[in-house]
Amino acid sequence: MAKTKLSTGVEVEMREPKVRDMRIVATYKDEVEKELNLIGNLTGLTADEIDELSLKDYGLLQKELTSFLS
C-alpha cells in the first residue's frame, strides 16, 4: 500500500494491483480508460473524483501506479 499526498492536502492510499484488477481493466480498449479505471479500483476514488484532480495530482497517482507495475 502506498500513500500519496495531493496538493489539496488529502492523502490517497493506493493498494498494490492484483491479477483480478488487470483482468477487470483488460475489457477496456482505450489505454486512458484502462488507467483511469485501474487507479479508481486501487484507490477507491470515483470517476468524478478522478476527473476533478489537477493534472499534477493525477500525475502523482500515475507515478505510484507505474511503480507497482514495473
PLM segments and residue spans:
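Short, surface-exposed, charged amphipathic helix/loop patches that serve as local interaction elements
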Residues: M1-S70
